[in-house]
Amino acid sequence: MRILVLEDDRVQQGRIEQTLLDIGRSRNLRLEIDIAKNYGDVEKYSQYFDNYQLYLLDLEIDGERERGFQVAQQVRERDPFTSIVFVSTHSEALPLAFRYHLSALDFISKDQSEEDYRHQLERCLDYVLAVSYTHLRAHETVLD
């Protein structure tokens, strides 16, 4: 599974990457994780938007509070069905996701316990795997 993380805080970058890698190891999953540290990095990775199955986006990037929503809009323009999860301390901004019509899979608060944080990430990975498997099976059925 290919994942793009948008996070500008180094501590949080390490936290999310390590948690994902731990989950991947415990479940024998092959995870390819790219980390965009700022909006400029997102532009660099945007040519590969079609290749990611999951986006984990912080809301506030480079001091701009809605930057994560703007990135999610760009992703949606290229792929209306991919999974987007917001990972942030700004839970009060979550209603804005509806204004942007982003169909986010989840919102993960950075302020929760490590156990809850990991559990939410696991549930998101499980969902993406299930959807990918369903699409693969549907594709195989069409080919048969």
Q: Which ranges hold each PLM region?
A:
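Non-catalytic signal-transmission and effector/linker regions of two-component phosphorelay proteins
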Residues: 1-2
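Conserved acidic carboxylate
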Residues: 7
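Charged phosphotransfer/docking patches of two-component systems
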Residues: 10-17, 94
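Acidic, metal-coordinating helix/loop segments flanking the phosphotransfer/catalytic sites
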Residues: 17-18, 35-54
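Short hydrophobic/Thr-rich beta-strand motif most characteristic of the beta2 strand and flanking loop
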Residues: 25-39
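CheY-like receiver
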Residues: 52-129
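Single conserved hydrophobic/aromatic residue that forms the stacking wall/gate
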Residues: 135-144
